[in-house]
Design a protein with these regions (language model features):
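Short-chain dehydrogenase/reductase
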Residues: 1-55, 65-72, 77-80, 252, ...
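Hydrophobic, Leu/Ile/Phe/Ala-enriched alpha-helical segments that form helix-helix packing faces
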Residues: 2-9, 35-43, 92-100, 138-146, ...
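Residue-level signal for the nucleotide or nucleotide-sugar donor/cofactor binding architecture
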Residues: 23, 87, 183-186
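N-terminal Rossmann-like NAD(P) cofactor-binding module of classical short-chain dehydrogenase/reductase
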Residues: 58-62
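Catalytic loop of short-chain dehydrogenase/reductase
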Residues: 63-177
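N-terminal targeting segments with Sec-dependent signals, encompassing both cleavable signal peptides
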Residues: 73, 83, 182, 265-269
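C-terminal helical subdomain
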Residues: 156, 160-162, 171-259
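ACP-dependent fatty acid/polyketide chain-elongation machinery
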Residues: 250-275
């Protein structure tokens, strides 16, 4: 973020970096309050405006940790994953879009919802598939829940395979096999360009009428058997490493060093003495 600010920020731009645990509803609410209220420091009878009250324009709720676990592992860990990936996203949209209701009547918060074609396709990724399915429901609720939707516009890209990210980095060894099956994978720079394109004035005008859907799957959801690809890649890797390896020369091990025997404390038994 700091490098992006240094290289591309325009004159007068400001960068604010605020620590927040987005799995905590309390932190989500506190962050919204911090954004929407001015920060003033008073010293010696003089008040200094440190941060003005801000009205959010764009929201990229892309915070995501590593996910793991099968359906059989459903429990507190998957609940924590869903809280970060879904419930905190909904709470953030509601809280941030409400800022400036009295002063910026026609303002809309433009939200880029990070969708995915993954509906359990990979397997073993915890609540991820269920959460991405739930983002489809948020898009549908935009048309039926005007109390928040009238101040929100949605762009819903369904993002496919992005190489080298925290979520997909572990699957990078399968990239060659996936691309051979006809699936396009994205670099982080390529997908960033596509996401920024969803923030233009034209797209935001369209999203004010109805949510904008964007297919960035690269064919990932088109009946691609990822389990079979993973198994075939594992077999190929095992075949490459199954060639006999020439044994290295060995020498007899040196004798073990002598270990001193520690003396045990004598057993004096019980005794009594007058003090």
């Amino acid at each position: 973020a700091t490098e992006l600010y240094r290289q591309h920020a325009s004159n007068g731009a400001q960068l604010w970096m605020v620590p927040a645990n987005l799995s905590s509803y309390r932190d989500v609410d506190a962050l919204a309050q911090w954004i929407g209220n001015a920060e003033v420091v008073t010293s010696g009878g003089t008040s200094t405006l440190v941060k003005p009250a801000l009205v959010p324009t764009l929201l990229f709720p892309f915070a995501a940790g590593r996910v793991a676990g099968s359906l059989a592992d459903a429990g507190p860990e998957t609940e924590s994953q869903a809280r970060l990936l879904l419930w905190s996203v909904e709470r953030s949209i509601a809280a941030l879009s409400a800022i400036g209701t009295d002063t910026n009547v026609d303002h809309r918060l433009h939200v880029i919802l990070p969708g995915s074609p993954n509906r359990g396709t990979f397997g073993g990724d915890g609540a991820y598939g269920e959460v991405k399915s739930a983002l489809d429901a948020i898009v549908n609720r935009w048309s039926s829940e005007k109390q928040w939707a009238q101040r929100v516009s949605l762009a819903h890209p369904r993002i496919g395979w992005v190489r080298g990210t925290g979520l997909m980095g572990g699957n990078d060894p399968l990239v060659a096999a996936v691309e051979a099956a006809g699936v396009r994978t994205w670099s982080t720079e390529e997908i960033a360009h596509e996401l920024v394109e969803l923030c233009t004035e034209q797209v935001r005008a369209q999203a004010a009428v109805k949510p904008v859907e964007a297919d960035l799957t690269g064919g990932l959801g088109d009946n691609v058997d990822l389990v079979a690809l993973r198994e075939n890649a594992a077999k190929a890797a095992a075949g490459q490493t199954s060639e006999p390896v020439e044994a290295s020369a060995t020498i007899a091990a040196l004798p073990s060093p002598a270990t001193p025997v520690q003396s045990t404390a004598p057993n004096w038994g019980e005794f009594e003495a007058d003090l």
